[in-house]
Amino acid sequence: MTTAHRPTFHPARGGTARGEGDLSKLSNQYSSKDMPSHTKMKYRQTGQETEADLRKKDLRRELEDKERNAIREKRARDSASSSSSHSKRQRMDQIAAESAASVDADEAVDELNSSDDDDSDEDDTAALMAELEKIKKERAEEKAARDEEIKEKEEKQRMENILAGNPLLNDTPAGSSTSGGDFTVKRRWDDDVVFKNCAKGVEERKKEVTFINDAIRSEFHKKFMDKYIK
């Protein structure tokens, strides 16, 4: 193990090395970490699984004792669980009997009360059925009227579409902007852009076109300024 992490208790001192004079006999200082720590051999004691202890043990008898103890503990647990399950079963049977008795008593009381309420329930049921039939009839009439109105609107719209789609039956002029008689060709989205048809009219120009290496004095710049700036 390295001792580089330990503090330095013996710094460099002169006087005793070769080529140095004897200054004096300096006192020595020792640290407890520099002293020997383990100076005695340790031997196995009694009960630490020595060879003599292992020879004295009867491993077969110990194994048989452990097996007997395990069987005895298992039987004790089984008997305790069986007794607890038997007591639990008895308790559940008792609870079931009590609940059955309470249910029978409740049924008897319900039969007495139901016999008194049968007459009033029949009258209420008849009134509710009559009201329900009335509501159903009103809703059916409303639905029929609504369907008839929707049908009339659809027929009217269909006839309008037929008349608008026939140019012979449409009285609006062809140049108008109405939706029914607009037969003119629509303008393109790029009709009014700045640099459209820049090469138009090149053939009509004079053959003696001179090139000027100045964008400001060029013919294109002059025409552009005349058209869009002035």
From Swiss-Prot:
Residues 104-125 have a biased composition (Acidic residues). It comes from the Eukaryota. The keyword Nucleus applies. Residues 25-34 have a biased composition (Polar residues). Residues 47-82, 119-164 form a coiled coil. One of its GO terms (biological process) is mRNA splicing, via spliceosome. Keywords: Coiled coil, mRNA processing, mRNA splicing, Nucleus, Spliceosome. One of its GO terms (molecular function) is RNA binding. GO terms for cellular component: catalytic step 2 spliceosome; nucleus. It is found in: Nucleus. Its main location: nucleus. InterPro entries: Cwf_Cwc_15 (IPR006973). Residues 1-157, 164-183 are annotated as: Disordered. Residues 52-78, 131-157 have a biased composition (Basic and acidic residues). Belongs to the CWC15 family. Component of spliceosomal complex. Component of a spliceosomal complex that is required for activating pre-mRNA splicing. PANTHER family: CELL CYCLE CONTROL PROTEIN CWF15, SPLICEOSOME-ASSOCIATED PROTEIN CWC15 HOMOLOG. This is Spliceosome-associated protein CWC15 homolog. The gene is cwc-15.
